[in-house]
Amino acid sequence: MKLVIAEKPSVGAAIAAVLGANEKRSGYFEGSGYLVSWCIGHLISLADAATYNEQYRKWKYDDLPIVPQDWQFTVASGKEQQFSVLKDLMHRSDVSEIVNACDSGREGELIFRFVYEQANCKKPFSRLWISSMEESAIREGFSNLKDGRSYDDLYQSALCRAKADWLVGINATRLFSILYHKTLNVGRVQTPTLTMLVNRDYAISSFKKEKYHVVRLNAGGVSALSERLNDEAAAQQMKAACEKSQAVCTSLKKEKKTVAPPKLFDLTALRREANRLYGFTAKQTLDYAQALYEKRLLTYPRTDSKYITSDMQDSTKELITGLCSLLPFMRDVKLQADLTRVCDNSKVTDHHAILPTAEFLKAGFSSLADSETKLMTLVCAKLLCAAAAPYEYEAVTAAISCGGYTFTAKGKTTLCEGWCEIEKLSRAASEEQDEDAEPETVLPPLAEGQTFDNPAAEISERYTQPPKAYTEDTLLSAMENAGKEETPEDAERKGLGTTATRAGIIEKLISAGFAERKGKKLIPTKDGYNLAAILPEVLTSPQLTAEWETRLTGIAKGSDSPDDFMRSIEEMTAGLVKTYSAISEDKAKLFTPQREAIGTCPRCGAAVYEGKKNFYCSDRACSFVMWKNDRFFEQRKKAFTKAIAAALLKDGKVKIKGMYSTKTGKTFDGVVLLADTGGKYVNFRVEQNRK
């Protein structure tokens, strides 16, 4: 009997159906000599600090750095039952072999190995490596199972990454939270991402726009621009000179240019385009893609490759033929598919690019939600564009001389629409416009030496523009490329985060209060600014990730030592704790919430603030305080709210509805007066207005 362990229930169910394991049990399928179960993602994780020592439940500087010598693991909360199922299955006497069917790559390896180790399993295991949930792909994968132990170095790389993130995250988060009296989540990926947001927002807010002028010359249907002019008088002089002169085309340059078809989608590219066109967040795009994958309509979405392998060419061309028949906007397009640009075995590691499946050709869009339809259309259109001919055009640059000045006119003429035709048709069919698309400017026929009488000139006043705020589209791109120049070419991961985790990083920054969404823009908050300012560069720069990936790639290849890597991480963590042992009192107040005065003290004129139990005067020498549990309000069964306190401070009275009368047992409306006599306690009284 073989036990197959998938990463998710949906994947397990799909594999079970193909293998003929059709008998549903509690937490697994059985049949045809197979048991098929699943992990529910990260079933086992590194234990938290308190597992090692109960005193770590309280965050204290003296306990830092926390460096486990004997690492411990724990079952994820709420997933205990499924781990128990897997453990029992692993130890069944009739199970002779285990198949690791978790996602291919570093994290999938980690997920399986953690379960295998936690269950104390010693049985041999093999590795399933597939990129599609289609039946043919699953069958082929099982006919080519690999030796599980050949991935030991990959597992060590994954384990080192997990431990290093734990050490930096736990210690840096506790260190800076203790120093600044606020929970400050610090992470190797999250913090540099926040810093990029802060740097961009600061560049925008500190940008000083500068005015400049441009003279536009209109001659014989040609519109040509001058260079930038900082002086308005110079622009006026140019305009006057041109209107008295004849214009001449002094040079004409024509150049044929080609724009190659786009590559296929990896997850980051899909997220970027979905955000730009539809406003989908990165998390939404992954959720929609995952749902399509589980419906067998889309290949594995968490890929970082934009290529297919050579053995996929024939099946991919069949997909293209089917899409041309399925998609209405392709009916009049003659497409001769060429996949050579996106076929590269060396650039497909864990999984190939995101593609529609053959199952989608049968099912179509009929059962899909609107969001899934949009995403599926993007993937289909990208495949068709990638297989189409290049876009070819003629670029024309003309120099026009007039009044002693030179102007430039640029235009282009399409020679072959190629893949751009498909992109335009796809956009039109979905009624979406690409805001970044540039309009095509066509120049009239021109020749060198051609003259133009009575040219017209006009002055345009313009301003330099600040950088644009990050959107999820542009931030994902920045994360993908951060630190790339320092990362080895063959590293499994480049940039900040992975194709699968970047969305979670953005969401975490928002939920922690360090960033916020304003429309499509991502903006850092005040706390985000402060956090980026207080942390050392080693935590705010993508350099750390680049260095780690260099080492982790070496570990995965067997050329670097896991022990040496972990020793360097421990030394870095200890150095952080030692360097940041104390801060000034002013810095410690950076994350203190800004207090908002609710009114003015009737005794001394100082500001009155709301506390947990009272409303108090900010002048410590003044004894004015109104208690929220004042018996006056409790007897009348009314909460002493901030709004009531503010009204009393402003007007000395407030109208309150539904107060309870202890004499009549009924409610009444009345005006409450602030009857302060300057004593230890503030008094209140009612001018009743009974119903």
Regions found by a protein language model. Give the residues of each.
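Intrinsically disordered, low-complexity regulatory segments
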Residues: 1-162, 166, 465-466
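Amphipathic alpha-helical transducer elements in NTP-driven molecular machines
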Residues: 9-16, 33-36, 40, 76-87, ...
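C-terminal or mid-to-C-terminal helical accessory/interaction module adjacent to the motor/catalytic core
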Residues: 137-217, 254-255
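Conserved short loop/turn motifs at secondary-structure junctions
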Residues: 1-3, 101-104, 181-183, 254-263, ...
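Basic, low-complexity terminal or inter-domain segments flanking catalytic cores
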Residues: 2-3, 79, 90, 173, ...
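Metal- or metallocofactor-binding catalytic centers and their adjacent structured scaffolds
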Residues: 232-265, 271
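Phosphate-rich ligand and nucleic-acid binding surfaces
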Residues: 223, 253-254, 324
